[in-house]
């Protein structure tokens, strides 16, 4: 198998073969991360630039660590202290990094479509530089979708995570789906895997047209939590994106928790071996109760963080010209 994508901008058009390449390569790097010296020279001499125009701790740190574990040189761009504050355009800033000899650009922006604009400019120039979307507006967060997919598959078969493991498995995605780019990427990945995906949330945060989010596929929509949880093997709960909400979308955080917060009692409706995921940061007592948060036998949140490094290593490696491990 040969990786063909120059840019990873979203999962809407990912093929099953591409998902499998990412899962297989991520598993190899997950093993690397358990070694006494968790570093390989595969991207030595490559320059990786993180262009984060939106606050981020987890994603930025995960990408930076992934690049350094691959021995790449990492440049962190800070918009507040850059020429952007002096009137330079985003494209001009990107052109500067291209002229410096960058190999990969990791882009996070509050506006949907910015990574696509940069990728289009790179393609227009005929440059081999790759763009990796680290989250753009309400569009997508592909690396979170891929790490969630890897976490689920690895939980079911740690030695050989693969797409078909999720075939027919009921997975509930709960919460602020309207404002969640994570939900969008997760939906694409899980539907591609053949999972039975259910969406649950308040009507103001889960429009009914999400049922047709994936062309040719109808997703069950639940405005009450219990039907979505019944028999679910996994539950992915989402952070309430209060910074993106209008003031009338939720009566209060307490009311949200009352109707949609995950508690140990509610999780009894699920499969006996249910596991909970959350992209972080978690609002304790809102999306998840503390008892669920503190039970490592119930949630996979720490595994998501660990797997995030391996998955981002895999993508950087593949986009940087690496070969698929046998």
From Swiss-Prot:
One of the protein's GO biological processes: 'de novo' UMP biosynthetic process
GO MF entries: amino acid binding; aspartate carbamoyltransferase activity
Domain of life: Bacteria
Keywords per UniProt: Pyrimidine biosynthesis, Transferase
Pathway given in the UniProt record: Pyrimidine metabolism; UMP biosynthesis via de novo pathway; (S)-dihydroorotate from bicarbonate: step 2/3
Binding site for carbamoyl phosphate: 58-59, 108, 141, 144, 280-281
SUPFAM superfamilies the UniProt entry points to: Aspartate/ornithine carbamoyltransferase (SSF53671)
NCBIfam families named among the record's database cross-references: asp_carb_tr (TIGR00670), PRK00856.1 (NF002032)
Protein name (Swiss-Prot/TrEMBL): Aspartate carbamoyltransferase catalytic subunit
Organism: Synechococcus sp. (strain JA-2-3B'a(2-13))
């Amino acid at each position: 198998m040969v990786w063909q994508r120059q840019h990873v901008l979203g999962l809407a058009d990912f093929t099953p073969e591409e998902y499998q390449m990412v899962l297989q390569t991520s598993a190899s790097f997950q093993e690397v991360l358990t070694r006494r010296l968790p570093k390989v020279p595969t991207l030595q001499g490559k320059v990786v630039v993180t262009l984060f125009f939106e606050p981020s701790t987890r994603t930025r740190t995960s990408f930076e660590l992934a690049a350094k574990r691959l021995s790449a040189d990492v440049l962190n761009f800070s918009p507040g202290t850059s020429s952007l504050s002096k009137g330079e355009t985003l494209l001009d800033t990107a052109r500067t990094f291209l002229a410096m000899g960058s190999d990969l650009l990791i882009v996070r922006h509050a506006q949907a479509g910015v990574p696509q604009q940069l990728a289009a400019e790179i393609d227009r120039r005929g440059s081999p530089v790759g763009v990796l979307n680290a989250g753009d507006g309400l569009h997508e967060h592909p690396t979170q979708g891929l790490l969630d997919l890897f976490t689920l598959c690895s939980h079911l078969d740690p030695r050989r995570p693969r797409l078909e493991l999720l075939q027919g498995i009921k997975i509930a995605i709960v919460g602020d789906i309207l404002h969640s780019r994570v939900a969008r990427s997760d939906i694409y990945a899980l539907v591609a895997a053949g999972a039975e995906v259910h969406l649950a949330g308040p009507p103001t945060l889960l429009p009914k047209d999400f049922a047709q989010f994936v062309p040719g596929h109808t997703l069950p929509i639940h405005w009450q939590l219990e039907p979505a949880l019944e028999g679910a093997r996994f539950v992915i709960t989402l952070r309430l994106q209060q910074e993106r909400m209008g003031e009338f979308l939720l009566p209060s955080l307490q009311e949200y928790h009352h109707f949609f917060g995950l508690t140990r009692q509610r999780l009894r409706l699920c499969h006996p071996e249910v596991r909970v995921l959350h992209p972080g940061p978690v609002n304790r007592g809102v999306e998840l109760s503390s008892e669920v948060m503190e039970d490592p036998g119930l949630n996979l949140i720490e595994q998501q963080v660990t797997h995030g490094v391996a998955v981002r290593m895999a993508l950087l490696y593949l986009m940087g010209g690496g070969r698929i491990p046998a």
